[in-house]
């Protein structure tokens, strides 16, 4: 079986393998010049034969990635309405994300 890891970023958890492309919430310190992304909150690793479960994180495990692009999510529409008062309000929101390609799993 192929090695994989479970990482936590932006209060969400992702199962990643080398070569995967994931969309994560914006991270501090990431720009077009600084394209390397390090995920140090690794909750679980599997190297093909042995699994390591963190308490709460696996000690020296790091997942490395590189920035592919800045993307925006789907539009979420919220609609406020009050009956018989001729009041309605439509609000839209699009979340900004980083598209990251996983380059290495260091276990």
UniProtKB/Swiss-Prot annotation:
Spell out the disulfide connections. Answer: none
What PROSITE patterns is this protein classified in? RIBOSOMAL_L21
Q: Which InterPro entries match?
A: bL21-like, bL21-like_sf, Ribosomal_bL21, Ribosomal_bL21_CS
Q: Name one GO biological process term.
A: translation
Q: Cellular component terms, GO, for this chain's entry?
A: cytoplasm; ribonucleoprotein complex; ribosome
Protein keywords: Ribonucleoprotein, Ribosomal protein, RNA-binding, rRNA-binding
| Highest rank taxon of the organism | Bacteria
Q: Which SUPFAM superfamilies match?
A: L21p-like
Enumerate the Pfam families for this protein.
Answer: Ribosomal_L21p
What are the recorded GO MF terms, alphabetically? rRNA binding; structural constituent of ribosome
Which family does the entry's similarity section mention?
Belongs to the bacterial ribosomal protein bL21 family.
Q: What does this protein do?
A: This protein binds to 23S rRNA in the presence of protein L20.
PANTHER family, alphabetized: 50S RIBOSOMAL PROTEIN L21, LARGE RIBOSOMAL SUBUNIT PROTEIN BL21M
Subunit structure as annotated in this protein's UniProt entry: Part of the 50S ribosomal subunit. Contacts protein L20.
Name used for this protein in its record = Large ribosomal subunit protein bL21
